[in-house]
UniProtKB/Swiss-Prot annotation:
Family that this chain belongs to: Belongs to the GrpE family.
Assigned GO CC terms: cytosol
The encoding gene: grpE
InterPro entries given in the database record: GrpE, GrpE_coiled_coil, GrpE_head
Keyword Cytoplasm: yes
Protein name: Protein GrpE
Parts of the chain that traverse the membrane: none
HAMAP family per UniProt: GrpE
GO molecular function: adenyl-nucleotide exchange factor activity; protein homodimerization activity; protein-folding chaperone binding; unfolded protein binding
Source species of the chain: Acidovorax ebreus (strain TPSY)
Superkingdom, taxonomy of origin: Bacteria
Length: 178
């Protein structure tokens, strides 16, 4: 045999090399597993923190809505107190004349309308001839009239809006088709 030829490795050498490769691969995989476990634990922690933060934000939002409702009603009620005071003062007068009662009622109505306006309540009181709007008007009856069909003839009861939302539609009579 010549010395330049590579002798084939012995089975023991092959087994030792495979064992070393397997050990290296096992160490690499164990390191990768440890990294992935750490990353998983970190992500689980981030998830729990985000979930808790979302729950806290939801609770804060609910509390703010409840406070807004409470204080919104409080503000509205506060604006009505002068109306109550005026009515109490009117009832305290024992010998009021009809004219005094009328003047007091007018003043009280102005106070009430002012309070409603401050709270964005708007009157719906369509003029005769206005096109009937089913979103703001409720037709009580149709009557023959000398005006265009489906227009308001008269208002039986005013309606009210709050921020473009109908609280109560205006009750109206409507011109019947000719």
């Amino acid at each position: 045999m010549s010395e330049n030829q590579n002798p084939s490795p012995s089975p023991e050498e092959i087994e030792a090399a495979m064992s070393a490769n397997a050990a290296d691969e096992l160490n690499r995989l164990q390191g990768e597993l440890a990294e992935l476990k750490a990353k998983s634990a970190d992500l689980a922690d981030q998830f729990l923190r985000a979930k808790a933060e979302a729950e806290n934000a939801r609770r804060r939002a609910e509390d703010e809505v409840a406070k807004a409702r409470k204080f919104g009603i409080e503000s509205f009620a506060e604006s009505l107190l002068p109306v109550c005071d005026s009515l109490d003062a009117a009832l305290a007068i024992e010998n009021a004349t009809a004219e005094q009662l009328r003047e007091g009622s007018d003043a009280t109505l102005r106070q009430l309308m002012s309070a409603l306006e401050r709270n964005k309540v708007v009157i719906v009181n369509p003029e005769a001839g206005t096109k009937f709007d089913p979103h703001q008007h409720q037709a009580i009856s149709m009557v023959p009239a000398d005006q265009e069909a489906n227009t308001v003839v008269s208002v039986l009861q005013k309606g009210y809006l709050i921020s473009d939302r109908v609280l109560r539609p205006a009750l109206v009579t409507v011109a019947a088709p000719k």
